[in-house]
Amino acid sequence: MLVPRKIVFFLFLLVGLSLYAQQDYFVSSYVRGNFYNRGRIAAESLRASDDLIFLNVRPHKDGSLSFENPRVFQEKGVTTWEDLIKSVRADVKGTKAKLRLGAAGGEWKAMVADEAARTTFAKNIKKVLGENKLDGIDLDFEWAETEKEYKDYSLAILKMREVLGDKYLFSVSLHPVSYKISKEAIAAVDFISLQCYGPSPVRFPMEKYASDIQMVLAYGIPKEKLVAGVPFYGVTKNGSKKTEAYFSFVQDGLITTPAQNEATYKGEVYVFDGQDHIRTKTRYAMEQQLKGMMSWDLATDMPLKDSRSLFRTMLEELGR
């Protein structure tokens, strides 16, 4: 018996919608110890994340490591990066959240330019991951600018994967102004987060967000490896590149509607992603069937239980 075309069409549509609804979207978040000590990162926000990254390690040019410890607040809080991880691990006990180390800054350009240093760096990272029972590493090296820097960074990524093997979760964080790592490096990582934000207000409109995502997809980053990053902070509209936490706007009583994307704070106009914008950007990532979402960061948002929380809006759109 022949099945009418309309019925076939609707069957395909239902299957597509079902797959769309069932996709398990990944949620990656950064944890900053200084803000953790100040009580600015809610335990429920940590527990709602699939991936928690601690940006506490800096590479030296020879591949050795230095670590940034959190500062106490009002004589309270953890004082070492190891204790920060232990405390957060207790916060998320009973969840499937992965805890990973994040490497940023330092003398990374000199390190990745040297073959021996790349190997030393990767081995040191693996040792730290093992000693602290961590789930992996995120590289947030800002930013490769020249062809040589992209090549060196890509070689460092390949060396990291070679040393780590498949035991650890390995990601890199890139930006629309700096994303052209090699195809081999793209294949080597588990996922790539794209920082669709910055100190410049041009990054905030939905149109720019969508075009940046399409740009890196066209370059060759697979959609199933791409995690879209959104900001939980605002920047000055005049391009002076000042930043301020969304939390501050709420605390000052400046947020009056989910549709709001501008606020005048201490005499200056800031642009930011309000709740409706976060919802729209999250929905776009889902429509594009990306791996998931990332934010910068939990400390600049409201607690998850607050109805004005941007993270809460993101999770609602993801079906959490």
Language-model region placement:
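Glycan-binding loop/region signatures in secreted carbohydrate-active enzymes
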Residues: A48, E68, K223-M286, L304, ...
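Conserved, mostly hydrophobic/aromatic
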Residues: L52, L101, L139, I192, ...
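Generic structural signal for well-ordered alpha-helices
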Residues: W81-R89, A122-L129, S154-R161, M206-Q214, ...
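Active-site groove signature of glycoside hydrolases
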Residues: G105, N124-Y150, K180, Q195-G198, ...
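Bacterial N-terminal signal peptides that target proteins for export
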Residues: M1-V8
